[in-house]
Amino acid sequence: MPSRIPSSNDPVLPGRELWGTERFWHFAHHEHQGAFDMVSIFVVDVGSRHLSIEDWRKAWSKLYRTFAVLSQKISDDSGEGKIVDGALRAEESFFTGPILQDDQDRIDYSLQQRRFDCLSLTVFATSGTEHESFHLAISNPHALGDAKGIFAIGKALIQGVLSQTQAELQSPTSPPPQPSLKAFTTSHNQDLGLKAMFEVARTGSSIGFPILPKETSAELEPASREWRRVFTFSPAQTETLVQLCKAKALTVSAWLQATILHALIDTLVDDKGDEKAEQTFTVAAMPFHSPLSVSGATSTIFAPISIRVGSKAELNDIAEAVAESFGLARRFAEDVQDDYVKTLLKLFGSVRLETSVPTFSSLGRLDTVTGLKRYHVVARNNLPTTGIHAWTLNDQLNLTLSWAPARFRRDHIEKFWSTWIGTIKEVVA
């Protein structure tokens, strides 16, 4: 199988410069050992169909007709990252993996591979008793697509393989139309520009998970293989939550973000007796503006939000503050995003983070895909950060928490996780 790692003799290929949030994701990848590289896992039940790895290879190759991003790669040959079109053939991005025990093992295996300058597919071997299921991993640099865009590719791949007729298999799946970013902004989309966003960013967060110094973290927290937690709610619990949010005129994403902040206060604030005590949270708000964000440009709004809530604030009060801030972030002017990220990167190296508030990526309700039993998405967490993903698949809400191993106190992680999930359980009981 040809290597996807370019040799030093490869010619310098033409390409376009990175823009906006692409710059940020590539900076993290290049300067911080692949930080935020992504892996998406698809567990597919093929039923009585007798499929082989070769069937997946053919279907992957056919997707190159539909998704231009599959032939793109991030190149650093010129000294600055750029996106190169037509730089990859299907056979260069298809791999097979070994028999592994569970989904987390497949995630760990995928993150250890040098396959993050472009999109690639790994089909894992299965034992004889598991021939009815296939385990797939799509790996990608964040600059080439977000989780929802990669899910769209996985969906098209699965539908292609499971097509009932050869004619269906040969007909490429058309990607959904990609709306403009302006469709998600209001008529006041120029209200927020660089100055407003930098003022918000300077606010910072008053509390967060304390980051252990790298030089002492190994002594304080013994190295652990575990770096991720997952919880899945039942369809009934998920529907209860959806109806609750509708009744409160809130999105599920805003309500979940509020529960995260509420759980952080419960975890980290020992004395909440002062009625006037306030907490400030500043996090990056990155709402997806397209169901398919793999057209060669990342499609997130890199705008920080900041809210102030009392240490004894009720969950509903926090949720309303979050919803208001999300609305504010959506008015961040599109044409200043690139300048904002450029300036942000200049400041990035001069700031030493002391605490971490979990980033929150909500994919919403994903399309039902025939045969898709399970799905996971992760981002490499080798910076001293914490991150949360949320998605609903097959009417079940899935929540994950990931963290950089040995950079946070285990008791903080454990208490936050149990408090957060426990709060949601109480509401949907």
Swiss-Prot record:
E.C. designation(s):
2.3.1.-
Task: Report the pathway entry.
Answer: Secondary metabolite biosynthesis
- This protein's source sits in the domain of life called Eukaryota
Keyword annotations for this protein, in alphabetical order, are: Transferase
Induction cue: Expression is strongly induced under conditions of nitrogen starvation. Expression is positively regulated by the cluster-specific transcription factor rua1 that recognizes and binds to the specific 5'-T/G-G/T-C-G-C-A-T-A/T-C/T-C/T-G/A-3' upstream activating sequence found in all promoters of the UA biosynthesis genes.
Which regions form coiled coils? none
Q: Which GO terms describe its molecular function?
A: transferase activity
Q: Where is the signal peptide?
A: none
The residues that cross the membrane are: none
Family as reported in the entry's similarity comment: Belongs to the alcohol acetyltransferase FCK4 family.
Function statement: Probable alcohol acetyltransferase; part of the gene cluster that mediates the biosynthesis of the glycolipid biosurfactant ustilagic acid (UA). UA is a secreted cellobiose glycolipid that is toxic for many microorganisms and confers biocontrol activity to U.maydis. UA consists of 15,16-dihydroxypalmitic or 2,15,16-trihydroxypalmitic acid, which is O-glycosidically linked to cellobiose at its terminal hydroxyl group. In addition, the cellobiose moiety is acetylated and acylated with a short-chain hydroxy fatty acid.
Name the chain's protein. Answer: Probable alcohol acetyltransferase orf1
Q: What is the organism of origin for this protein?
A: Mycosarcoma maydis (Corn smut fungus)
